[in-house]
């Protein structure tokens, strides 16, 4: 890069420092996989504003690539588990969740999912032990004098490192199973009467039966997640900190929660002052397409194009399913751009082109795009909302069924089950979403809502990180409920006291009435006898 451009970039970063009043040092404890894609957008913006960002990278991480992030600093440390072990487990989790897990109720799939997540938790406990027991690494972090730690709470340990370094920390989170982390650690208020539990597949206005299912799911996830986290993790945290503690107690010291969702996707519920919703922070205006792709899109004429992508984490599907999908795509008049990394289907039509990679945001922002076939990942959904494109949802795993259920409830999508859908089902869904203006109208309303914010989601995320650095925390925003034991938080001691008082008063009243009754009965008998 020419020297004058380096100087200009340096001056730009310095100007951001003066504007914010402080150029800080940010330590990051990330999670791998698609979670890294979301957090990296925030980190890049922090660097652009002149902050120094250091990412702790376990050697077992395979998705997080330092070579693709030249502006960030990385501290890579060795782990006792290998990259292949973590990758193989993740692939196994995807395959089982996508093709084997029952989807009737949370109770039907939870025993299988429970075993997968237990193993996943073990991997991250091992990585955490490798990090905090690395004396050379911890000494270097201590000497670096970081201002704040930014972490993903699904990969526990960032809070422990922040505690050891005596620095404030904040979380970036999409969801946790059953909203357990949000409720037990963040004290989020999520009444099961009208807030669907994540992974329940419910959305919008719930019937009585739905609310019964929702309550059962909530109770199950609360019980399951308690068992998942409260043995080895608690013991380990207590050993490292040198005092009896729990992982929940340490995590509850978080200053700010940045939730990667927003009210265009979510349904309303009560929130807290130390929680901000930053869904769609990666969305941006479309850029021009590559020349050959633009020519293909323009060749669609008035019919337009359909964009088909099942995300970055799924590379292929069964040959039978791919052929069924390709056949349905060949029946529509639109041109189709399909992100697919498998064997070319025999039924692929002349209107469909297959790509190993697509500029998804740029395609969704193209004026000729009519519909988006998606697995329901939050990133893709927000790009579709941002550009106002109706969807055909084929959810695979994680929160995707819930995300698509929300879009269906808001009238912006049609949902299909990848295991049971036929080629005719897929064709019918395509024709419904493309030809019925109902879906376009509803998604455009969501798009308008998303764009009508006083501050962009990315700017809000950066603001809160800088806020924590400026003020050394945000204790004034944390609910006092964090300092209460569970029985006080739920007012069980007050309820018990009031019930006791009521019981005592009731008992005294009954005794007084009995005494008066006996007194007057005896008096009446005495008068009769006289």
From Swiss-Prot:
Question: Where, subcellularly, is it found?
Answer: Microsome membrane; Endoplasmic reticulum membrane
Record field: transmembrane: 494-510
**InterPro entries with a match to the protein in the record:** UDP-glycosyltransferase (IPR050271), UDP_glucos_trans (IPR002213), UDP_glycos_trans_CS (IPR035595)
Does this entry carry the keyword Cell cycle? no
Provide the topology term for how it sits in the membrane: Single-pass membrane protein
Reactions mediated catalytically: glucuronate acceptor + UDP-alpha-D-glucuronate = acceptor beta-D-glucuronoside + UDP + H(+)
The signal peptide annotation in the UniProt record is 1-23
Write down the superkingdom of origin: Eukaryota
One Gene Ontology cellular component annotation held by this UniProt entry: endoplasmic reticulum membrane
> Can the keyword Glycosyltransferase be found in this entry's annotation?
yes
One Pfam family name is UDPGT
What modifications follow translation?
Autoacylation in vitro.
Q: What is its EC number?
A: 2.4.1.17
The protein's role, per its UniProt record: UDPGT is of major importance in the conjugation and subsequent elimination of potentially toxic xenobiotics and endogenous compounds. 2B2 acts on various endogenous steroids, especially etiocholanolone and androsterone.
Which PANTHER family is this protein grouped with?
Answer: EG:EG0003.4 PROTEIN-RELATED, UDP GLUCURONOSYLTRANSFERASE 2 FAMILY, POLYPEPTIDE B38-RELATED
Which family does the record claim for this protein? Belongs to the UDP-glycosyltransferase family.
What is this protein's name?
UDP-glucuronosyltransferase 2B2
The scientific name of the source species is Rattus norvegicus (Rat)
Question: The organism's lineage?
Answer: Eukaryota, Metazoa, Chordata, Craniata, Vertebrata
